[in-house]
Amino acid sequence: MRIDGHTRLAAVVASPIKHSISPFIHNLAFEKTHVNGVYVAWEIPESDLAETVENIRRYNMFGINLSMPYKEKVIPFLDGLSPEAQLIGAVNTVVNRDGRLIGHNTDGFGFFASLKNFNPKDTHIMILGAGGAAKSIVTQAVLDGAKKVSIYVRPQSLVKAKENFRTLLDQTDCYLEFHDLTDADHFQKELRQTDLLVNATSVGMDGESLPISIDTRFPKELLVADIIYQPFETPFLALARKQEIEAVNGLGMLLYQAAGAFKLWTGENMPTGAIWQELENIYNS
């Protein structure tokens, strides 16, 4: 990687963020595409967010990525939002267009790009969880033409979940339903008619917990996905694979959301195949 007077900067902004794999992904992409850029991690307090965004203009940066807790808090400092970022109400990528800062959200795009043989159009999808990741995935599914999306949460979270998806409910005609995750009978019944089941919660990061009953039976044509990539195989994915069901972890989502941001910044396609091999060497060891 060369750094000279023409090198442009990109960064990921969050707190905490020093653990992030994003600098590894993007700097490898800059190197392999011969784009003169460098990517760093900025761990900042909220009081520095406005100035950090202004620095994108000041230093003619490509832009920034954002993670928690700034995906929503950054919006007032931007000049505009992409359609998906408007629907989600959160931004993970800011693009500098000649000094005009536009917020995008590539999380949903990244998720579906990681499912190589799955097209959301006219499908029935079940999502576990209603947080930021779930909202990004559901929004992208709606934009891509999903027929029905069912969102499963704990009973005490049902009211909040519906409110969290209010904008999407008001502005789209996709059939969205909200259900109690503890109702195992209803869950199993709907699962028989479902094309894709997604765990969009953090349950399973400990390598032990399951977000659903261990007695759940998966239909043979189902695709199962988890947004978690550490551990490489969660108990949720292990349950699916034990039943010989195709199962995908969250490492691809991490890579392809980065690829979406890289394309917006540089106009270049990230060499995802080569970078995927490097990531697998790190996480599947």
Swiss-Prot record:
Q: A biological process (GO) annotation for this entry?
A: shikimate metabolic process
- UniProt keyword list: Amino-acid biosynthesis, Aromatic amino acid biosynthesis, NADP, Oxidoreductase
The annotated active site, in chain numbering, is: 71
Instruction: Give the highest taxon in the source lineage.
Output: Bacteria
Q: Name one Pfam family in it.
A: SDH_C
Q: Which residues make up the binding site for shikimate?
A: 20-22, 67, 92, 107, 229
Q: Which SUPFAM superfamilies match?
A: Aminoacid dehydrogenase-like, N-terminal domain (SSF53223), NAD(P)-binding Rossmann-fold domains (SSF51735)
Task: Report the CDD domains cross-referenced here.
Answer: NAD_bind_Shikimate_DH (cd01065)
What sort of enzyme, by top EC class, is this? Answer: oxidoreductase
**Family designation:** Belongs to the shikimate dehydrogenase family.
Main function: Involved in the biosynthesis of the chorismate, which leads to the biosynthesis of aromatic amino acids. Catalyzes the reversible NADPH linked reduction of 3-dehydroshikimate (DHSA) to yield shikimate (SA).
Quote the subunit structure annotation. Answer: Homodimer.
> What is the designated name of this protein?
Shikimate dehydrogenase (NADP(+))
Q: Which organism is it from?
A: Streptococcus thermophilus (strain ATCC BAA-491 / LMD-9)
